[in-house]
Amino acid sequence: MAGTGNDNPGNFANRPKEEVQAIASKGGQASHSGGFASMDPEKQREIASKGGKASSGSFEPGSEKAREAGRKGGKASGGTGADDDE
């Protein structure tokens, strides 16, 4: 293995050059088939027409829990904090 000091096998620097080249030669090809893009166009339209309504959702819009989650998310985003109340 390469001398990176990191033995994580997911790190390309730790893999043999030939293996990395084989992976790279696949480019952006998906590692699996399926998902929205491979669906029948009619099925795609059916799902898309629901516009997120099929999502179970975590919060009732405007609820205190939703506001709290939004505050926490904003703090975790690494913003400047200029608009923070605290």
UniProtKB/Swiss-Prot annotation:
**GO BP term, pick one:** sporulation resulting in formation of a cellular spore
Sorted keywords for this record are: Conidiation, Differentiation, Sporulation
Where along the chain is composition biased (Gly residues)? Answer: 75-86
* Signal peptide annotation: none
| Residue spans of biased composition, Low complexity class | 49-58
Determine if rRNA-binding is one of this entry's keywords: no
Q: Where is this region: Disordered?
A: 1-86
Q: Spans of biased composition, class Polar residues?
A: 1-11
> Could you tell me where the Basic and acidic residues compositional bias lies?
62-71
Instruction: Give the family from UniProt.
Output: Belongs to the con-10 family.
- Protein name as it appears in the record: Conidiation-specific protein 10
Species of provenance: Neurospora crassa (strain ATCC 24698 / 74-OR23-1A / CBS 708.71 / DSM 1257 / FGSC 987)
